[in-house]
Swiss-Prot record:
Disruption phenotype: Embryonic lethality. Embryos cease to develop prior to 6.5 dpc. Reduced assembly of 60S ribosomes and accumulation of halfmer ribosomes. GO terms for biological process: bone marrow development; bone mineralization; cytosolic ribosome assembly; hematopoietic progenitor cell differentiation; inner cell mass cell proliferation; leukocyte chemotaxis; mitotic spindle organization; rRNA processing. This is Ribosome maturation protein SBDS. The modification Phosphoserine is found at S238. GO terms for molecular function: microtubule binding; ribosome binding; rRNA binding. It comes from Mus musculus (Mouse). It is found in: Cytoplasm; Nucleus, Nucleolus; Nucleus, Nucleoplasm; Cytoplasm, Cytoskeleton, Spindle. Its main location: cytoplasm. Required for the assembly of mature ribosomes and ribosome biogenesis. Together with EFL1, triggers the GTP-dependent release of EIF6 from 60S pre-ribosomes in the cytoplasm, thereby activating ribosomes for translation competence by allowing 80S ribosome assembly and facilitating EIF6 recycling to the nucleus, where it is required for 60S rRNA processing and nuclear export. Required for normal levels of protein synthesis. May play a role in cellular stress resistance. May play a role in cellular response to DNA damage. May play a role in cell proliferation. Gene3D superfamilies: 3.30.70.240, Ribosome maturation protein SBDS, N-terminal domain (3.30.1250.10), SBDS protein C-terminal domain, subdomain 1 (1.10.10.900). Keywords: Acetylation, Cytoplasm, Cytoskeleton, Nucleus, Phosphoprotein, Ribosome biogenesis. The modification N-acetylserine is found at S2.
Amino acid sequence: MSIFTPTNQIRLTNVAVVRMKRGGKRFEIACYKNKVVGWRSGVEKDLDEVLQTHSVFVNVSKGQVAKKEDLISAFGTDDQTEICKQILTKGEVQVSDKERHTQLEQMFRDIATIVADKCVNPETKRPYTVILIERAMKDIHYSVKPNKSTKQQALEVIKQLKEKMKIERAHMRLRFILPVNEGKKLKEKLKPLMKVVESEDYSQQLEIVCLIDPGCFREIDELIKKETKGRGSLEVLSLKDVEEGDEKFE
């Protein structure tokens, strides 16, 4: 769709329209396609990357800009950038059925890709293929939420799939290097957060190599910094502890 605005002679292309009704009137903003979801999920923070123009319209396709008095009446301000933010956050994205279907299909595939990348069969430590995760998502009738980020939805999918199949987040492999004095005491606090201790070395310092659930990383990092007052170190050896080859459904 190509739009010509007579007010500022800017030709708008590749437009996604976001609409809001307020005070009995319709207001629209012109955004770049595929950017609205990024803004709403917090991935995109630069407003200029989302908005084609900071103007508020009553009809984007006709280039009809909203009147100042209508903006003040509906929003209590004529600050168009602030109004654009409101519409962008709470308005309704206008897309065709075909576009919506394509977007949902792509999000479904993206969610499956994230799940396949982050998870394994806990018994074999092998990853599942994206195709198998997609099939499993269809089996549980997972419905994509267009206003939620794919990462958030991937976490939801993992929880739901756990009830139907053998799947869990792949473990991270870490190395801690801790001062000996605080090391033994700190190890006891770290124990509940470690899944598997692969090696321990007591020499001048305490060195531990272990596997953890990725969700515990921040807590472990903060605990080591706090208890050692910055003298301990934490190194990520691998983001995923997996075996070679893909897992197959039996």
